[in-house]
Protein backbone atom coordinates (compact mmCIF):
# COMPACT_ATOMS: atom_id res chain seq x y z
CA UNK A 1 0.00 0.00 0.00
CA UNK A 2 2.90 2.37 0.65
CA UNK A 3 4.17 1.90 -2.88
CA UNK A 4 0.72 2.25 -4.44
CA UNK A 5 -0.17 5.38 -2.48
CA UNK A 6 3.16 7.00 -3.40
CA UNK A 7 2.83 6.05 -7.06
CA UNK A 8 -0.69 7.48 -7.33
CA UNK A 9 0.29 10.73 -5.62
CA UNK A 10 3.48 10.96 -7.66
CA UNK A 11 1.64 10.54 -10.95
CA UNK A 12 -0.87 13.18 -9.93
CA UNK A 13 1.94 15.55 -8.96
CA UNK A 14 3.68 15.04 -12.30
CA UNK A 15 0.45 15.60 -14.26
CA UNK A 16 -0.49 18.63 -12.16
CA UNK A 17 2.91 20.19 -12.82
CA UNK A 18 2.70 19.31 -16.52
CA UNK A 19 -0.67 21.06 -16.71
CA UNK A 20 0.94 24.12 -15.14
CA UNK A 21 3.63 24.00 -17.82
CA UNK A 22 0.96 24.03 -20.53
CA UNK A 23 -0.82 26.95 -18.89
CA UNK A 24 2.43 28.88 -18.46
CA UNK A 25 3.03 28.61 -22.20
CA UNK A 26 -0.43 28.62 -23.78
CA UNK A 27 -2.96 30.32 -21.51
CA UNK A 28 -4.33 33.50 -23.13
CA UNK A 29 -4.27 35.34 -19.78
CA UNK A 30 -0.83 36.84 -19.11
CA UNK A 31 -1.42 36.78 -15.34
CA UNK A 32 -2.18 33.05 -15.43
CA UNK A 33 0.91 32.41 -17.55
CA UNK A 34 3.09 34.25 -15.05
CA UNK A 35 1.62 32.59 -11.96
CA UNK A 36 1.76 29.07 -13.40
CA UNK A 37 5.28 29.77 -14.63
CA UNK A 38 6.26 30.56 -11.04
CA UNK A 39 4.64 27.32 -9.89
CA UNK A 40 6.56 25.32 -12.49
CA UNK A 41 9.85 26.88 -11.35
CA UNK A 42 9.08 25.89 -7.76
CA UNK A 43 7.86 22.38 -8.45
CA UNK A 44 10.49 21.31 -11.01
CA UNK A 45 13.23 20.30 -8.52
CA UNK A 46 10.62 18.66 -6.28
CA UNK A 47 9.15 16.55 -9.07
CA UNK A 48 12.57 15.56 -10.39
CA UNK A 49 14.05 14.55 -7.04
CA UNK A 50 11.04 13.28 -5.10
CA UNK A 51 9.71 10.96 -7.79
CA UNK A 52 13.08 9.49 -8.72
CA UNK A 53 14.02 8.92 -5.06
CA UNK A 54 10.73 7.18 -4.45
CA UNK A 55 11.12 5.29 -7.73
CA UNK A 56 14.29 3.70 -6.37
CA UNK A 57 12.73 3.02 -2.97
CA UNK A 58 9.61 1.43 -4.42
CA UNK A 59 11.56 -0.72 -6.88
CA UNK A 60 13.84 -1.99 -4.12
CA UNK A 61 10.82 -2.71 -1.92
CA UNK A 62 9.21 -4.72 -4.71
CA UNK A 63 12.43 -6.66 -5.21
CA UNK A 64 12.36 -7.40 -1.48
CA UNK A 65 8.80 -8.71 -1.77
CA UNK A 66 10.10 -11.35 -4.20
CA UNK A 67 12.66 -12.49 -1.64
CA UNK A 68 15.69 -14.25 -3.12
CA UNK A 69 13.87 -14.69 -6.42
CA UNK A 70 13.83 -10.92 -6.82
CA UNK A 71 17.62 -10.92 -6.96
CA UNK A 72 17.97 -13.37 -9.83
CA UNK A 73 17.72 -12.44 -13.48
CA UNK A 74 14.79 -14.66 -14.45
CA UNK A 75 12.20 -12.59 -12.56
CA UNK A 76 13.25 -9.28 -14.09
CA UNK A 77 13.30 -7.29 -10.86
CA UNK A 78 17.08 -7.01 -10.81
CA UNK A 79 16.92 -5.32 -14.21
CA UNK A 80 14.34 -2.82 -12.95
CA UNK A 81 16.54 -2.11 -9.92
CA UNK A 82 19.62 -1.44 -12.05
CA UNK A 83 17.66 0.67 -14.53
CA UNK A 84 15.93 2.86 -11.95
CA UNK A 85 19.10 3.59 -9.97
CA UNK A 86 20.36 6.06 -12.58
CA UNK A 87 17.24 8.25 -12.29
CA UNK A 88 18.30 10.20 -9.15
CA UNK A 89 21.69 10.87 -10.80
CA UNK A 90 20.34 12.30 -14.03
CA UNK A 91 19.46 16.00 -14.23
CA UNK A 92 22.39 16.98 -12.01
CA UNK A 93 21.74 14.57 -9.09
CA UNK A 94 18.99 14.97 -6.53
CA UNK A 95 21.22 16.72 -4.03
CA UNK A 96 21.59 19.53 -6.54
CA UNK A 97 17.81 19.63 -7.01
CA UNK A 98 17.44 20.02 -3.24
CA UNK A 99 19.97 22.87 -3.19
CA UNK A 100 18.12 24.49 -6.09
CA UNK A 101 14.86 24.38 -4.13
CA UNK A 102 16.24 25.53 -0.79
CA UNK A 103 18.96 27.88 -1.98
CA UNK A 104 17.37 29.46 -5.05
CA UNK A 105 13.65 28.81 -5.42
CA UNK A 106 12.69 29.32 -1.78
CA UNK A 107 14.06 32.90 -1.42
CA UNK A 108 13.55 33.89 -5.06
CA UNK A 109 11.44 37.04 -5.63
CA UNK A 110 10.92 37.45 -1.87
CA UNK A 111 9.10 34.13 -1.60
CA UNK A 112 6.80 34.71 -4.58
CA UNK A 113 7.29 31.19 -5.94
CA UNK A 114 6.37 29.66 -2.59
CA UNK A 115 3.12 31.61 -2.54
CA UNK A 116 2.03 29.90 -5.77
CA UNK A 117 1.81 26.67 -3.79
CA UNK A 118 0.96 27.85 -0.30
CA UNK A 119 -1.94 30.13 -1.21
CA UNK A 120 -4.01 27.60 -3.25
CA UNK A 121 -3.37 24.95 -0.59
CA UNK A 122 -4.55 27.28 2.16
CA UNK A 123 -7.60 28.23 0.09
CA UNK A 124 -8.44 24.54 -0.33
CA UNK A 125 -8.27 24.01 3.42
CA UNK A 126 -10.56 26.97 4.05
CA UNK A 127 -13.10 25.79 1.47
CA UNK A 128 -13.21 22.17 2.67
CA UNK A 129 -12.55 22.26 6.42
CA UNK A 130 -16.24 21.71 7.24
CA UNK A 131 -16.80 19.02 4.61
CA UNK A 132 -17.79 15.86 6.48
CA UNK A 133 -15.99 13.53 4.08
CA UNK A 134 -12.88 15.64 3.69
CA UNK A 135 -12.34 16.68 7.31
CA UNK A 136 -10.30 13.64 8.36
CA UNK A 137 -7.83 14.45 5.58
CA UNK A 138 -7.90 18.24 5.69
CA UNK A 139 -6.97 18.39 9.38
CA UNK A 140 -3.66 16.46 9.13
CA UNK A 141 -2.84 18.20 5.86
CA UNK A 142 -3.34 21.59 7.50
CA UNK A 143 -0.92 20.62 10.27
CA UNK A 144 1.65 19.37 7.76
CA UNK A 145 1.35 22.55 5.69
CA UNK A 146 1.81 24.74 8.77
CA UNK A 147 4.85 22.66 9.66
CA UNK A 148 6.30 23.26 6.20
CA UNK A 149 5.69 26.99 6.48
CA UNK A 150 7.40 27.00 9.88
CA UNK A 151 10.39 25.11 8.48
CA UNK A 152 10.58 27.50 5.53
CA UNK A 153 10.66 30.52 7.84
CA UNK A 154 13.29 28.86 10.04
CA UNK A 155 15.54 28.15 7.06
CA UNK A 156 15.12 31.64 5.65
CA UNK A 157 16.17 33.18 8.97
CA UNK A 158 19.06 30.82 9.67
CA UNK A 159 20.33 30.86 6.10
CA UNK A 160 20.89 34.60 6.16
CA UNK A 161 23.57 34.26 8.81
CA UNK A 162 25.05 30.90 7.88
CA UNK A 163 24.93 29.45 4.35
CA UNK A 164 25.75 26.00 5.72
CA UNK A 165 22.25 25.91 7.20
CA UNK A 166 20.69 25.77 3.74
CA UNK A 167 23.01 23.02 2.55
CA UNK A 168 22.47 20.97 5.70
CA UNK A 169 18.69 21.21 5.44
CA UNK A 170 18.16 21.06 1.67
CA UNK A 171 17.51 17.34 1.15
CA UNK A 172 15.21 17.05 4.16
CA UNK A 173 13.41 20.22 3.12
CA UNK A 174 12.75 18.88 -0.36
CA UNK A 175 11.33 15.67 1.09
CA UNK A 176 9.17 17.56 3.58
CA UNK A 177 7.89 19.85 0.83
CA UNK A 178 7.36 16.90 -1.52
CA UNK A 179 5.29 14.96 1.01
CA UNK A 180 3.10 18.00 1.65
CA UNK A 181 2.68 18.44 -2.11
CA UNK A 182 1.67 14.77 -2.38
CA UNK A 183 -0.84 15.34 0.41
CA UNK A 184 -2.33 18.20 -1.58
CA UNK A 185 -2.57 15.95 -4.63
CA UNK A 186 -4.46 13.41 -2.57
CA UNK A 187 -6.90 16.09 -1.43
CA UNK A 188 -7.59 17.03 -5.04
CA UNK A 189 -8.16 13.39 -5.93
CA UNK A 190 -10.39 12.85 -2.90
CA UNK A 191 -12.78 15.60 -4.00
CA UNK A 192 -13.44 13.58 -7.14
CA UNK A 193 -13.40 10.20 -5.40
CA UNK A 194 -16.05 11.14 -2.83
CA UNK A 195 -18.38 12.42 -5.55
CA UNK A 196 -18.13 9.15 -7.52
CA UNK A 197 -17.56 6.49 -4.86
CA UNK A 198 -21.09 5.09 -5.23
CA UNK A 199 -20.65 4.51 -8.95
CA UNK A 200 -17.34 2.66 -9.07
CA UNK A 201 -15.21 0.76 -6.55
CA UNK A 202 -12.15 2.36 -8.17
CA UNK A 203 -12.91 5.58 -6.30
CA UNK A 204 -13.47 3.77 -3.01
CA UNK A 205 -10.03 2.23 -3.43
CA UNK A 206 -8.57 5.71 -3.89
CA UNK A 207 -10.09 6.82 -0.60
CA UNK A 208 -8.53 3.85 1.19
CA UNK A 209 -5.12 4.61 -0.32
CA UNK A 210 -5.44 8.27 0.64
CA UNK A 211 -6.26 7.30 4.22
CA UNK A 212 -3.12 5.14 4.30
CA UNK A 213 -1.04 8.04 3.00
CA UNK A 214 -2.35 10.49 5.58
CA UNK A 215 -1.99 8.03 8.45
CA UNK A 216 1.31 6.34 7.59
CA UNK A 217 3.33 8.53 5.22
CA UNK A 218 2.48 12.21 5.71
CA UNK A 219 3.62 12.09 9.38
CA UNK A 220 7.17 11.62 8.07
CA UNK A 221 7.19 15.40 7.59
CA UNK A 222 7.56 15.71 11.37
CA UNK A 223 10.89 13.86 11.50
CA UNK A 224 12.19 15.89 8.56
CA UNK A 225 11.33 19.12 10.36
CA UNK A 226 13.09 17.94 13.52
CA UNK A 227 16.20 17.03 11.53
CA UNK A 228 16.23 20.44 9.85
CA UNK A 229 15.89 22.21 13.20
CA UNK A 230 19.07 20.50 14.46
CA UNK A 231 21.03 22.86 12.20
CA UNK A 232 24.41 22.45 10.53
CA UNK A 233 26.78 22.62 13.51
CA UNK A 234 27.28 18.88 14.06
CA UNK A 235 27.27 18.12 10.33
CA UNK A 236 30.14 20.56 9.76
CA UNK A 237 32.10 19.69 12.93
CA UNK A 238 34.02 16.58 11.79
CA UNK A 239 37.47 17.51 10.40
CA UNK A 240 38.64 16.03 7.09
CA UNK A 241 40.89 13.47 8.79
CA UNK A 242 37.86 12.17 10.67
CA UNK A 243 36.62 10.61 7.44
CA UNK A 244 39.71 8.38 7.20
CA UNK A 245 38.37 4.82 7.24
CA UNK A 246 41.74 3.26 8.13
CA UNK A 247 41.53 1.99 11.69
CA UNK A 248 43.85 3.72 14.16
CA UNK A 249 42.73 1.59 17.10
CA UNK A 250 45.79 0.19 18.85
CA UNK A 251 44.01 -2.48 20.80
CA UNK A 252 45.26 -1.06 24.09
CA UNK A 253 42.56 -0.44 26.66
Provide a role label for each language-model segment:
Residues 1-8, 30-50, 68-75, 89-93, ...:
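Alpha-helix capping and helix-loop boundary segments enriched in small/acidic/polar residues
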Residues 3-14, 21, 51-58, 91, ...:
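Alpha-helical transition-metal enzyme core signature, strongest for iron centers
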Residues 6-16, 122-128, 134:
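Long, non-coiled-coil amphipathic alpha-helical linker/lever segments
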Residues 8-47, 152-168, 189-201, 205:
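C-terminal helix-coil-helix/basic helical segment that borders enzyme active sites and/or dimer interfaces
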Residues 13-16, 54-58, 117-120, 144-147, ...:
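Amphipathic, well-ordered alpha-helical segments in soluble domains
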Residues 19, 60, 103-104, 185-191:
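Short glycine/serine- and small hydrophobic-enriched flexible loop segments
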Residues 38-118, 212-252:
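Alpha-helix capping/hinge segments and adjacent helical runs
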Residues 108, 124-253:
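C-terminal amphipathic alpha-helical interaction region
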Amino acid sequence: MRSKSLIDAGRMLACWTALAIDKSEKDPDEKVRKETGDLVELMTPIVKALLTDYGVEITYDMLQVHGGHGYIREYGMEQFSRDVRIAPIWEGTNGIQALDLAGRKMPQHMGRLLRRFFHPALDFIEQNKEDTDMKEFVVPFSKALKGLQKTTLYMAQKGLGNPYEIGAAATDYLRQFGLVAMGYMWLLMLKVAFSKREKDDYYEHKIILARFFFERILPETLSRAITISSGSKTMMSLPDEGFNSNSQFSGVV
